[in-house]
Amino acid sequence: YAVREGRKKVTAVHKANIMKCTDGLFLDVAREIAKEYPQIEFTDSIVDAMCMRLVMHPEEYDVLVCPNLYGDIVSDLCAGLVGGLGLTPSANIGKDGAIFEPIHGSAPDIAGQHKINPTACILSASLMLAHLGEAKAAAAIEKAITDVISEGKALTQDMGGTASTEEFADAVIAKL
């Protein structure tokens, strides 16, 4: 993934100092795989220290590789750094397939109320397009979203506006 996406650094996030068997194995495998990609800088970090550092210096990180439990926690922390769950897409990319989805889940408590921010869903589709080799289409979607948010006219409630889900989506479509 890091090579294909032009990334420069991968950090394995673990708790191998305590979880010696499971996270120790994860870290050993990460280090072995890293040897196959000498052009990519590889580091590892204990999850709690990395979370503190990520908040203080997010620019130090590029790709974080985590076991599922830590990945779930770290991804929510990262969502907070960029404005919240409503803005955050996710990609789970494996050897033989990939899944793209909003990080926030289905939000059943506000289903049908037309007030959910669709940005994470739209950006997840953009990530999928990029993964499928449609970089221009992905970039166009990202630019449209950036433009709509920057203008501030069609923002959903979580971004301080009054626009409905559909109004925000329509504004993005209009930019495309």
For each feature predicted by the language model, list its residue ranges.
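Glycine-rich phosphate/diphosphate-binding loop of Rossmann-like nucleotide-binding domains
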Residues: Y1-D48
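Glycine-rich phosphate/pyrophosphate-binding loop and the adjoining helix
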Residues: Y1-E5, V10, A16-M19, A135, ...
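Hydrophobic alpha-helical scaffolding
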Residues: A16-K20, I40-D44, V63-L64, K115, ...
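Short glycine/threonine-rich loop-to-helix capping motif typified by GTGT followed
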Residues: K20-V29, V55-D62, A79, K153-L155, ...
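Conserved structured core elements
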Residues: G24, D44-D48, T119, A135, ...
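Glycine-rich phosphate/nucleotide-binding loop
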Residues: R53-K153
